[in-house]
Amino acid sequence: MADDESSKNQAYVLLNVDYKHQKNIINKAKSFPTVQNVKTMYGIYDLMMILESDDMGSIKKTIDVDIHELDGIINMTSLVTVGTKDVHSILE
């Protein structure tokens, strides 16, 4: 049973940041249209951004341009998923 949410593309962006810039990174990231949530983490990473869009190009722009332009990012790992609609078209 597929719903509208399963057709959306998502990305989880895990960040190591300079603590002095963390608050600014969170505030700016929340203004990006594809960013649905920003979470502070304990452990290997400092922040996780959850991105979502019907358009993979929008997610790509957010990661490749918007997030990369933020001051204070030390390291970034992106985990990008594809919606079920995209998976079905690949498998056909």
Per-region residue spans from a language model:
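A compositional/biophysical signature of low hydrophobicity enriched in polar/charged and small residues
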Residues: M1-E92
